[in-house]
Amino acid sequence: MSLTKAIQDYIDKSPYLTNIDVELATMFNDAGEWAVALEHICTILAANDCALSSQEMAELESLINKTKKIEYEDFDDAFLNAVKEVSNTYSSRTSV
């Protein structure tokens, strides 16, 4: 499966993205701007305090790692770290 298709599948099934978020992420993804698409997704997840499950986090990290393997794609880890922080904060609140 191509990276573009894998990211689009993630975008399409994400319950956390609004229609405009989907449109923007799809636009970046279709242009081959995979890192930008994933950074946009991470920004939305963190800004909306979305606590991802371990499976959701693993899928997101897998896409990011695949993107990083492409020489000219630079993903800023600060975006993923923000999602992890939110997920850890909110998952610990709900598990108490």
Regions found by a protein language model. Give the residues of each.
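C-terminal-biased regions
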Residues: 1-96
